[in-house]
Structures are given as structure tokens and as C-alpha cells.
A protein has these predicted regions:
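A short beta-loop-beta micro-motif enriched in histidine and acidic residues
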Residues: 104-112, 124-135, 139-140
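A short, N-terminal "cap"/entry segment at the start of jelly-roll beta-barrel domains
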Residues: 12, 16-112, 239-246
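Double-stranded beta-helix
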Residues: 29, 153-171, 198-251
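Conserved metal-binding segment of the jelly-roll/cupin
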Residues: 179-201, 208-213
């Protein structure tokens, strides 16, 4: 597992990987996105998880608000989703809301928090982060299944044992080992640790929290197999609420 990272090497890894990574396009209809956001709000309510009031703003309420809302826009807070370019959100996709985040170029905040919804057997593909360390927390609902590999020197899947901590308890797994997080359990994922996750079949959708160092989804996701990330959107109806990728078009 990586323990230190050379800044210059990281910079070129970001550039090279993202040029390749962005070749795969995710495309989703706005009507599908609206439906997913509405159903997510209903699930958050059932789980008694409260979002900030601005999560429910209509698109027109954002007009001309950049100066007062730059902490939201610049730090990419808000609604976010992807089908990773597979055009089958229920099989391979993720919807989330970034509640707080820093921006190394614009503020001093060194941490981030997300809340995510993971459906039964809905996969977030195998990936690691060069820079970010994170805790993934099962906040309630079903069980979260996580598959783990160390990365090797060439950023492939290593066959070495995987050492992780779950709620402060050290555990050692075989390469490709699986952990199941029940509600209340969490895992710490260090930089360079490959992971994929999905909701366990038959247990219901999962409310998943993430607490981490500053999050940058434009340059700090190293997927084992290249995927799409921010979807191109077919505007078949008006947005109910904006995605983080919509801000530049509305503010």
C-alpha cells in the first residue's frame, strides 16, 4: 500500500489518467436524474437524515448568487450522481450529496463529508485515491459490501494481504477480500487502496456516509478500468435541483 506520494509524480498521474479516463462518456436524461433526486430526498427523510436548506433550491434561485454561494460552488457541494458511463444506473451507479468540502486553492478547510445512497447490488467500480484518505460509514438501512485490494507499483491489483481498520480495529484480509459493513460500522481506506462497493442483496438500500480529507472528483479517482464520471445530460425536462456539474450554467 502506498504511504507517501511525490507531488510532481502525482501531478503527472492526474493529467495522464484523466485524459484517458474522460474518453468514456456517461450520458443520462434529466428526467432520470430528477427522479433519482426526488426518490433520494424521500429516502433521506425516512432515515431522518437532514440536508442543508439550500439542497432544495430551484434552479432559478441560484441565478446571480455566486458571490454569496462561492463556498458551495467552488468546493463542489451539493447533488452529484453518475452511472460511470455504463448507461445502467441501477446496476452501476451512485447518487450522493457533498455536505462539506475544502479547496486547497481557496480556503483552509482540510476535510470533507458526503452522504450517499447505495442500492442492492448497485456497484461503484474498483478505484483508489492518490491523495484522499477516507472513512466509509454505514449510516443505516441495508449492508454495504466492500471488496479490497492493495495497489502495486504500476497501479494494478496487488496479491498482497490487505490491512485495514474498521472502527479502530485492525483486520487483515486476503487480496480481494470482502468486508460487509452493517449499520453503524465503518472502514478507513488509505490512499492507494483499491475498493469497490455495493449493497448486499436482500438487505435493502444503504445510507452511506463518507468523512475524508479534501475531496477532488476531477483528479483524485483512479479507477482500475476507466469509466465515465460526470454525465453529459439530455435535457428532456427542466432540472428539479441542480447538480454540482450544473452550477457553471446557472450562476
Amino acid at each position: 500500500m502506498h504511504s507517501t506520494f511525490n507531488i510532481i509524480k502525482l501531478h503527472y498521474q492526474y493529467l495522464f489518467y484523466n485524459l484517458y479516463y474522460r474518453k468514456i462518456s456517461a450520458v443520462m436524461k434529466r428526467s432520470e436524474i430528477n427522479h433519482l433526486i426526488i426518490s433520494s430526498i424521500e429516502f433521506f427523510d425516512r432515515m431522518n437524515f437532514k440536508l442543508p436548506p439550500w439542497a432544495f433550491r430551484k434552479p432559478e434561485e441560484w441565478k446571480g448568487q455566486y458571490e454569496t454561494c462561492r463556498g458551495i460552488v467552488d468546493n463542489m457541494l451539493g447533488w452529484d450522481l453518475t452511472d460511470f458511463g455504463f448507461n445502467d444506473f441501477q446496476k452501476c451507479g451512485l447518487i450522493l450529496f457533498t455536505i462539506r468540502n475544502g479547496n486547497p486553492d481557496k480556503d483552509k478547510k482540510p476535510y470533507a463529508e458526503k452522504i450517499m445512497i447505495v442500492e442492492e447490488m448497485q456497484e461503484t467500480p474498483m478505484h483508489f485515491h492518490w491523495s484522499k484518505m477516507e472513512d466509509i460509514i454505514n449510516r443505516g438501512g441495508g449492508n454495504l459490501v466492500i471488496e479490497l485490494y492493495n495497489s502495486d507499483e504500476k497501479e494494478g491489483l496487488s496479491d498482497t494481504p490487505v490491512a485495514v481498520t474498521t472502527d479502530g480495529i485492525l483486520r487483515t484480509l486476503i487480496s480481494g477480500g470482502i468486508l460487509v459493513l452493517t449499520p453503524g460500522e465503518s472502514i478507513c481506506l488509505e490512499q492507494g487502496l483499491y475498493h469497490r462497493f455495493y449493497g448486499e442483496r436482500g438487505k435493502g438500500k444503504v445510507l452511506v456516509g463518507e468523512v475524508s480529507a479534501v475531496n477532488d472528483d476531477t483528479s483524485d479517482n483512479r479507477f482500475y478500468k476507466p469509466v465515465g464520471r460526470f454525465p453529459a445530460i439530455i435535457e428532456d425536462e427542466k432540472p428539479v435541483h441542480l447538480l454540482v456539474s450544473d452550477y457553471s450554467s446557472y450562476l
